[in-house]
Amino acid sequence: MIYLIRHAHAVPAAEDPLRPLSLAGVHECAMLVRFFADNRLLLPGQIWHSPLSRSRETADRLTAGLNPDAARVEIPGLLGDDDPKLLLERINALPPRSEIALVGHNPHLTRLATLLVRGRSKPAFVDFKKGSVLALEKTESRHKRSDLPRWTVRWFLPAQLLKPRQATAPAQEA
């Protein structure tokens, strides 16, 4: 199983060119960790991340909160504009029952997910908002046109599902 995770919110480039996680991003990571720890849906043995601060920091927080023994590995091919085919061989060579999380950026994650599920990288079938997670499982079949191994969606957690709702004041009568 692989888990594609878009990094949490980062500070604007004008504020810090390295774009570390913002306070909102730190809270998003905490909500992700709490949800996955409570539901035992995500226990990766490895967490791959891009070299960018926001991806690395998201991976650090997931590792610390979900599996401190997980190997956290910076790998090439996870930047927003990278060709998703760069990771295909590495992903498809994973041993059965591997639990790997990939923390990256858009539009790369959307293209990678679409390539794994549909055998081509366009048109996209998923919208990765920051902090969203998609779980994919490799099947025994292959895509007819591309002959790539076929992956199936196990579940998708859009980030907005974990955000606390704002309380609204009851309507006042006139």
Report the location of each language-model feature.
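Conserved phosphate-binding catalytic cores of ATP/NTP-utilizing and phosphoryl-transfer enzymes
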Residues: 90-95
